[in-house]
Amino acid sequence: MLASQSVFVVDAHTTGTPIRVVTGGIPPLKGASVAEKMEDMRRNHDWLRTCIMQQPRGFLSLVGAILTEPCSPEADYGVFYIDSLTYQPMCGAGTLSVAKVLVETGMVKRVEPETKIVLETPTGLVTVYVKWENHMVASINLENVPAFLYRKDLHIDLAGYGDVSVDIGYGGNFFVLADVHSLGLTITKDTVNLLRSLSKDILAAANKVIKVAHPTNPAINYLDQVLFCQNVPEEDGGYLAQCIFGDAQADISPCGTGTSTRLAQRYFRGLIGLEETFVQKSVCGGAFHAKGLRETTLGGVPAIVPYVSCSDVHITGFNHLIVEENDKLKNGFVSW
């Protein structure tokens, strides 16, 4: 056996969403920021993304995290996110799993009762607080990048539904926030495939009438995720949501950046105050508890700093991926 490439990964999950944290095997990435390093991988090493994330080594719903040397002196590590289709500057569920991997493998020194980790992402610096009880991780808490409501009541022409009002928000990624009740739908395991299909039409319709641009990070200028929201709470007070990302992939977790975005939506619509807890749930039973820590501004745009907590983050395995030179499928593939 002649292996031309080795990649070391730690697999984890955040409320069921599979996260693959790449800890070794990526060539040194060039750039003066993690955003530039992500672009270097996109331009010059994209075959590694497809190799790691696609079949036969990966699968469609897998989320990847690439650890790098940070460029900011404040950060412990740099990180950006990948999936089978593309790159993402931020992933909340992924960041929670990254923190779990860093503390459990000794890549960051464990400090009890709380370990603080600063990560440089293409969206900016985020801080993660790992809380310990009885020498075990009890919860992982993300102080995310500022979140804001980009556009209220945007009207789109949605095929089969006519005129539909949605909001556009940002919490690490840009989202179309769609109220499922206004579409005559609910969020259940049985409707997820319908929501996946509908997300493509929603994104196409929204991108026809709006061009997004982050107020201080011009490279973040694309709208490619939909967060379907049930705005009537469950009996336990939580709110169901379903994020659709990538190639119409359904997030298994409640979605960390989506939770941050929805928190900002509710805050700027006057439905919740700072330090009030908002619980976003997935149909698979996962829950993220979020609150707004404080107000801020981004290039004059009002925003809040979200704090997202989860107690269901676990390591599932350690893997040494190899690429044999004569493997015809070494670059990966997507079947269906």
Regions found by a protein language model. Name each.
Residues 172:
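Glycine-rich ThDP/TPP pyrophosphate-binding loop and its adjacent helix/strand module
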Residues 1-167, 176-336:
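A glycine-rich beta-to-alpha transition motif near the start of alpha/beta enzyme domains, typified by
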